[in-house]
Design a protein with these regions (language model features):
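Walker A/P-loop nucleotide-binding motif
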Residues: 47-64
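Conserved nucleotide-sensing/catalytic segment adjacent to the nucleotide-binding pocket
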Residues: 87-127
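Short regulatory helix/loop adjacent to the ATP-binding pocket of P-loop NTPases
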Residues: 131-146
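Conserved AAA+ ATPase "SRH/arginine-finger" region at the nucleotide-binding site
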Residues: 148-160
Length: 193
């Protein structure tokens, strides 16, 4: 039997898409409008230390990424004491993303807040919960945290869910009828996570 002719091989194309974290990629609705306004106002903030809190998938990290880019901030997303201490000594604007999800080195955080203030820099923290739920024990740190302006991102509303859905379809070059989006929004979970 003669050998089978060589078949043309199909070459896989890497068409993976990285999520966009630019300001242009951000969908704004009443659920996140106050937090977006805060990020857009920088560096004209009411204080140099701010907290944005909201549920998982609400866009905290997206907003923080926009701010970090604009502020040329050092991003600290693993909040071990060594990372916080090193960041505090950097003399940079700081972003602590996802704070309050684990054990907090209160002394390191206290010094980071003081260091950014002394250097006339900014510190933005994002968290799933309000600082009152972080079980902080250090009185001076509690005082600093309580004095920080805080902005909440609410659960995604229909406008935000629809906007994100249209954007995701558009990113994949899929034209979707608004009725389909409305149908999906009325039936999906109220989360972007």
């Amino acid at each position: 039997m003669p050998p089978a002719p060589d078949r043309p091989r199909q070459l896989p194309l890497d068409l993976s898409r990285r999520p966009g974290f630019s300001r242009d990629d951000l969908v704004v609705s009443p659920a996140n409008r106050e937090a977006v306004a805060l990020i857009d106002r920088w560096p004209d903030w009411p204080a140099n230390f701010m907290v944005i809190a909201g549920p998982p998938g609400s866009g905290k990290s997206h907003l923080a990424s926009i701010w970090a880019h604009n502020a040329e901030a050092l991003i600290v997303d693993h909040l071990a004491s060594g990372a916080i201490t090193a960041a505090a000594q950097s003399g940079s604007n700081l972003l602590f993303d996802g704070f309050g999800d684990g054990k907090i080195d209160e002394n390191a955080l206290f010094h980071a807040i003081n260091s950014t203030r002394a250097a006339s820099k900014f510190l933005l923290m994002t968290a799933r919960t309000w600082p009152s739920q972080w079980n902080l024990q250090l009185p001076d740190l509690l005082s600093r945290i309580k004095s920080a302006p805080m902005v909440e991102i609410a659960e995604p509303d229909d406008e935000l869910l629809a906007g994100v859905m249209v954007k995701l379809f558009s990113d994949r070059q899929i034209d979707v009828d608004p009725l389909v989006v409305r149908f999906l929004v009325s039936r999906i979970e109220r989360s972007l996570a």
